[in-house]
Amino acid sequence: MPSPDTPVPSPSAPASGPASASRRYIAETRAFFASRAATWDTRFGDDMPAYAAAVARAGIRRGGVAIDVGCGTGRALPALRSAVGRDGAVIAADLTPEMLAQARPQAAAARAALVLADARRLPFADGSADAFFAAGLVNHLPDPQAGLAELARVTRPDGLLILFHPSGRAALAARHGRTLTQDEPLSAGPLRRSTAATGWRLAAYDDAVDHFFALAVRC
């Protein structure tokens, strides 16, 4: 769950095929976040209200199963528990063990299960989730469209996908010293096409100065 001011590693070129590229992606991602996990909330812990607002805006149904994929330190978990209510289920999944360790207090308070998992190959049954919350995740996957397809596999018809970042795309690009382009995965056109190609309907797209929010509905 990247912060507004922290660049994440770009997927590296494969050393010798897809399997090697996948292992390298996992190793680099874990190394990056493991080294920052202990101080993450100290540096970026003031944006929980923005996470809560994004969850509330999505309209997750009560009693459902909500999964925070790429959960980081668990900043969305209290809001997800509030959304699904006492009879719902909340799952926090992340690729980095150290991030899951930092998420334990939030997970305990939200009665959320912690799962070590790769967002590209989730250990959940087809159609078992009512909603996914993904903060700063999809555009950093080696293949964002394949990532959307995997999330679609796990989501029931009419289920929700919330893509979020507590900073708008232009502001985030400026902080990282790069120029924003319209062919990036989270640009409106590419995201609309990739969601449509993977079983989603893009229902809302809001790229503001102080947040990015997109809502897709499973077809």
Predicted features by range, described:
Residues 2-62, 75-79, 102, 162-185, ...:
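Conserved class I S-adenosyl-L-methionine
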Residues 67-121:
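Class I SAM-dependent methyltransferase SAM/SAH-binding core
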Residues 85, 141-142, 155-156:
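Helix-to-beta-strand junctions that scaffold the AdoMet/dcAdoMet cofactor pocket
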Residues 120-131:
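A short acidic, Gly/Pro-enriched loop at the edge of an enzyme's catalytic core
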Residues 131-143:
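A short SAM/SAH-binding and catalytic strip from SAM-dependent methyltransferases
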Residues 145-157:
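A short glycine-rich, Lys/Arg-flanked "PGG" loop and its adjoining helix->strand segment in the class I
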Residues 183-198:
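Short alpha-helix
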